[in-house]
């Protein structure tokens, strides 16, 4: 089974209708995998600047320009980009699934932040 994150990335570079509808709601922090997060950041940056779908070649070039990536990560990210082939997916299903994924990730991250804040407060209180 394909991960939703990978399916999202594939469609962000191949499906303009999907991109326009979903990119305003997807945040880079929703991606758990650092390589997927980098690819999303490059997609978002390109779309924000040029208002067009980026190609795999453009993404690879942009990743190469980053100074926050080591050689092993670069190889992994460029391999990930090379695997982002177009595959037909029913658009409405994909949008619904992406919306659910965004909600789930936002809730998870909010809960995680709350737990961390509670731990910090508990550990810094003086009795």
Stretch-by-stretch model annotation:
Residues 1-101:
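Noncatalytic partner-interaction/assembly domains of nucleic-acid and motor enzyme complexes
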Residues 82-127:
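Interdomain "pre-motor" coupling segment immediately N-terminal to P-loop NTPase/helicase cores
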